[in-house]
Amino acid sequence: MTRALVLSGGGPVGIAWEAGLLAGLAEAGVELGEADFILGTSAGSFVGSQLAMGRRPADMAAAILAEAERVSAAVAAGSRPNGGERPPNLAGLFALMQEARSGERDPKEVRKEIGKFALEAKTMDEESFIKSFGRQLSGPQAEGWPERGYACTAVDAETGEFMLWTAESKVGLARAVASSCSVPGVYPPITINGRRYIDGGMRSGSNADLATGHELVVVVGLRTAGDAATSERMRAPLEKEMEVLRAGGARTELILPDDASVEAFGLNLMDGRRRPAACKAGMAQGRALAAELRRVWN
């Protein structure tokens, strides 16, 4: 049986929750990182790249949990974590993303509009952004590509064209992942082969429909607090992507954050102070899901 794992976007907080979820599952003997194919979008591209390179979920989670000590130290010293900066307000961006995903307007044209906004925004420079990923995306491995099946997504900032980075793309892993994580207005578009690329989540939060051709596809999605109508509107595109997978003969399993995880996220997935709590919640959810998921994955 061929197995695929799809990891969705969700900012720094989403990275923490996904790492915790995977660690909790692995602790109970369910190794989603052993998938034949891993597809990552935005936050999921980073987590997926680590899995594809053989990094243990437990190690990812441990590094995130250690951040709690730094946050506590900053508060005790009377300073604010994250350099005193408030997490960015992305309400306008999210509204455009919803337009692109809902079909209200031509998705490619909306993505071009988002790309224009990203290209004009004042952000850190590209190299500083890539370096911010730390040693996990540095050195020789960052210039190559995982031997295991791995792909991540991006969008051309000028044309709105969607891009799927794979081993055949002949692109360095660090730049591919950075482009997938380039949240418009927050991080810089990334230059690859003379083009500028932004977050693959501008097409879809998960791009799960691209994982066709596998018998079992586990999709790890994200959701945040909101009323029922908002939640349904955000989930509808994902359900359509799952239908594409099932129409291709795949069995699908969808994992979404439980209520405890959503509470741990807070209101802004870009708020790095929430990462340790999100990771802990993910670990607890992973442990709780393990018995059920083991029956289909193992």
Regions found by a protein language model. Give the residues of each.
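Patatin-like phospholipase
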Residues: 1-41, 46-298
